[in-house]
């Protein structure tokens, strides 16, 4: 799907970003891996090269304008052009709003929203000049529904969705599409701590209609599709890749009874996630 294209992935050192880099290479793209962690980015580069494609490692802070510009210059200098960018860099800093330090708020917003803007703007200028390209942001269903206890995360991810739509609206007529992918629960190095408790892990799977959490590669598939020409008429949109979780509220509502039959339901709250089944009496 990406034969001959040159793609940048921010946050490409691990998780969804790494999976996107590897799949992009498998689909024929050369990949620039932009991340603050050079050592892990170099591991991703080796995985890209195993697919027979060229890899470029760019150590950078996505929230710095100078770094975003350098990212673009190095990519164009190495690959000749930029055909697409996936912005996936983020940092999750949990916290309740009444206690959240300003610096924690700023850290999340700087990486996950300001950083998306700076990198998309810098790469977008190259794509606008040639009249084609695709920009994909990795957001979250937490950007569509409030995720309490997660600090600035939901606000940041909601902003990423709107930024992707705005890019699509402003740049679509000039050949550059903007879209956003909203993953549900995915097991990555960033979220691994949430799955260490077996009860919480089981409870998280239980609230997904498919009965399991997602894999980074499944989110990468959506990213690659939106980068590709197969998505040529998809613009200013967002795609939920969550196993149906965001649309399953009624599945977790107690007291429903169909045809006189008792129904089981699972309860889940952020503070007490469980997969214990309770019978509707």
What are these regions (language model features)?
Residues 2-32, 167:
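Canonical Rossmann dinucleotide-binding motif of NAD(H)/NADP(H)-dependent dehydrogenases/reductases
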Residues 86, 172, 177, 234-236:
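Short, small/polar-rich loop/turn modules that mediate ligand/substrate recognition or access, typified
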Residues 96-97, 101-109, 204:
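Substrate-binding pocket helix/loop in short-chain dehydrogenase/reductase
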Residues 120, 156, 164:
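Active-site helix of classical SDR
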Residues 125, 169-173, 232:
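Alpha-helical segment proximal to the catalytic Tyr-Lys
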Residues 140:
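Residue(s) in the substrate-gating loop at a strand-loop-helix junction
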Residues 145, 224, 235-281:
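Short C-terminal tail/terminal secondary-structure segment
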